[in-house]
C-alpha cells in the first residue's frame, strides 16, 4: 500500500474539524501547499504556515469556525480520484458541487486549480477532491 498524501491531509483536516481543534499539522509537499493555497483563497481555512524540524517540513493549518457553537467552515472534504481509480474530466463535464457553493480541486496541466478556474481557462484534468 502506497502513501496517499491527499487522503492523509483530508483525513487530518476532517478529524480536526470533528474535534474542534484550532490547528492541523500535515507533511509539506508541493501538492499540499497548492491545495492549502486554494483552501485559504476560497475561505475554508484561516491561514497556514510552513515549519521545519530536523529536515522534515510540515504545514500547520489554522482552521476556521463560525458562531458560538464553532461550526466548521469545511463541512465535507471528499477524496474523488484515488491511486487505485483515477477520475479525469474535461472542462465541460466538471461537476458542480452543491450548485456551485462548494469547490472541486483539480490537478491540470496548468497546476492545481479550482473548478471555476478550470472552466475559465477551458482546461480539464484529474478531479482530486470536493470541498464544501
Swiss-Prot record:
Entry keyword Glycoprotein: no
Role played: One of the primary rRNA binding proteins, it binds directly to 16S rRNA central domain where it helps coordinate assembly of the platform of the 30S subunit.
Plastid among keywords: yes
Stretches that traverse the bilayer: none
Family statement drawn from the similarity comment of this UniProt entry: Belongs to the universal ribosomal protein uS8 family.
HAMAP family: Ribosomal_uS8_B
Domain of life assignment: Eukaryota
Keywords (A to Z) from UniProt: Chloroplast, Plastid, Ribonucleoprotein, Ribosomal protein, RNA-binding, rRNA-binding
Predominant cellular place of this UniProt entry's protein: plastid
Subcellular location: Plastid, Chloroplast
InterPro entries, A to Z: Ribosomal_uS8, Ribosomal_uS8_CS, Ribosomal_uS8_sf
GO molecular function: rRNA binding; structural constituent of ribosome
NCBIfam families given in the database record: PRK00136.1 (NF001109)
Protein name, entry field: Small ribosomal subunit protein uS8c
GO biological process: translation
Native source species: Anthoceros angustus
GO CC annotations on file: chloroplast; ribonucleoprotein complex; ribosome
Complex and partners: Part of the 30S ribosomal subunit.
Amino acid at each position: 500500500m502506497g502513501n496517499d498524501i491527499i487522503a492523509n491531509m483530508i483525513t487530518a483536516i476532517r478529524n480536526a474539524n470533528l474535534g474542534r481543534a484550532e490547528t492541523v499539522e500535515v507533511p509539506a509537499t508541493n501538492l499540499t501547499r497548492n491545495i492549502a493555497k486554494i483552501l485559504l483563497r476560497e475561505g475554508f481555512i484561516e491561514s497556514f504556515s510552513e515549519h521545519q524540524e530536523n529536515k522534515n517540513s510540515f504545514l500547520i493549518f489554522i482552521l476556521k469556525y463560525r458562531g458560538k457553537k464553532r461550526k466548521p467552515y469545511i463541512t465535507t472534504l471528499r477524496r474523488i480520484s484515488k491511486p487505485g481509480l483515477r477520475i479525469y474530466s474535461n472542462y465541460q463535464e466538471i461537476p458542480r458541487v452543491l450548485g456551485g457553493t462548494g469547490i472541486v480541486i483539480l490537478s491540470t496541466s496548468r497546476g492545481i486549480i479550482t473548478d471555476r478556474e478550470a472552466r475559465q481557462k477551458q482546461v480539464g484534468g484529474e478531479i482530486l477532491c470536493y470541498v464544501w
